[in-house]
């Protein structure tokens, strides 16, 4: 039988989260607002699968270009190629220093 190469394959360390008692995902992460042109860091929250980008983009920084429903369109360069990702705010953090 051929092994599966699913969306979360080869991401055992990257896609794990330490469970701490009395702590869950704060609602403020879901309610974050971003403006067009904001620089954001992509930090995947492994406990929320919806709106999650591919693990290769974890730790990258991009620019908000548009909003699509609850998610944001983030443009970044992957090598020399420009890419657009549709990511929910649970997996984004605003860059504080410019």
UniProtKB/Swiss-Prot annotation:
Q: What's a single GO CC term here?
A: ribonucleoprotein complex
Q: Where is this region: Disordered?
A: 1-28
Which UniProt key words apply to this protein? Ribonucleoprotein, Ribosomal protein
Keyword Thylakoid listed? The answer is no
Q: Which PANTHER family does its entry note?
A: 60S RIBOSOMAL PROTEIN L21
The entry's family comment says: Belongs to the eukaryotic ribosomal protein eL21 family.
What is this protein identified as?
Large ribosomal subunit protein eL21
């Amino acid at each position: 039988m051929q092994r599966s190469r699913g969306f979360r394959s080869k991401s055992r360390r990257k896609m794990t989260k330490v469970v701490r008692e009395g702590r869950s995902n704060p609602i403020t992460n879901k309610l974050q607002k971003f403006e067009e042109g904001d620089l954001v860091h992509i930090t995947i929250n492994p406990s929320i699968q919806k709106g999650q980008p591919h693990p290769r983009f974890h730790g990258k920084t991009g620019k908000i270009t548009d909003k699509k429903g609850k998610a944001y369109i983030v443009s970044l360069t992957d090598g020399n190629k420009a890419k657009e990702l549709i990511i929910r705010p649970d997996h984004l953090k605003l860059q504080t220093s410019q």
